[in-house]
Amino acid sequence: RQKKAMEMFGFPKENCFDSALELSRVPKFADAVINGTMDEQHVETSIPLLKKGYDMLLEKPFATNEKEMRELVSCVKENGNKVMISHVLRYTPFYLSIKERVASGEIGDIINIQTCEHVSYHHLSTSYVRGKWANSDVCHTSMLLAKCCHDIDLMMWMMSDTQPSMISSFGSKFQFKPENAPKEAGTKCLVDCPLVDTCRYSAKRLYLDQPKRWAFYIWDKLEGIENPTDEDRINLLKGDSNYGRCIYKCDNNVVDHQSVLVNFKNGATGTHNMVGGSAGPMRRIHIIGTKGEIYGDFEESKFTVAKIHPTKTDEKTVEVVDLNVNGDMVGAYGGHGGGDEKLAADFVEFLRGGKPSLACTSIFDSVA
């Protein structure tokens, strides 16, 4: 990967390193770094670079436990770095537009906020059953923190004038466990399973028949092959690839659905529901205020503003806002529904000392 990056972007060999620690041992030669390592590596890779004087755009969640969170915040305070957290969905036209309407007071004070995320069956099985975030002993994070820190952050952002006073949550590993496996199921889809052509979670159907789906996860071990063939892919899934395992017989220990209930200090409430294994991806939000409500679907990139109006025949005014931007992964405005590009631009402005945008999240905002 390092060699490929050198070729793509023209990096000189002396500016390529095998670790953050190795980078920290040479004289500082840039203003900032972008830390996009795995969740459990965020703190250990950030601290040497922060001590070296680099500012940073840090992927969320910026820490996976309270001890490391406090350690990182303390390091930033001691060294005076500018650290921005990559809460990219704040920058999407969908959520930013909703935040602006809420901040204007248009729907009054928020009484209740409801968010939900449905994780599609192929995303859940690839990332959270067979993949990198399937086992908390390996990735050192929970399903909620890994997948839904976006949604929890959005709830806190919309409720920025108050803080939680009490939180309760529960969930379970409902679907993907050995006792739910069909009796005929093998242990490896392409090796010993007679259901390889019919199971909806078959590695053949999910990955070989759709080789571009989640390719950056599934075929990562083939990166050294310039033009991998179908035979290369089959052999990988038959071999030691985690993605060739029976979906019901993996080492996953994270939940596949979870609900969260939040009570805020001002008396408002919030809920978040994460459900994995749905037919398609979905993120929704519904905010009810004292003057009206806002609700919408991120994937559809449209939301409705309904305001109380006693003299209207239907007792309310309704405005549908269609932003005409595709959802999470693709779109006319780039990845994450248009958020990626705006996040990068805001980070540059953040480094220059400009006025923070409504969406900007410093590390201190994240622990407030």
Predicted regions and their residues:
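Beta-loop-alpha module in the N-terminal Rossmann-like domain of NAD(P)-dependent dehydrogenases
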Residues: F9-C75
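C-terminal helical cap and adjacent loop that interface with cofactors, partners, or active-site loops
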Residues: F9, V254-A368
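Hydrophobic residues in well-ordered beta-strands that form the structural core
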Residues: N35, L58-E59, T64, V83-I85, ...
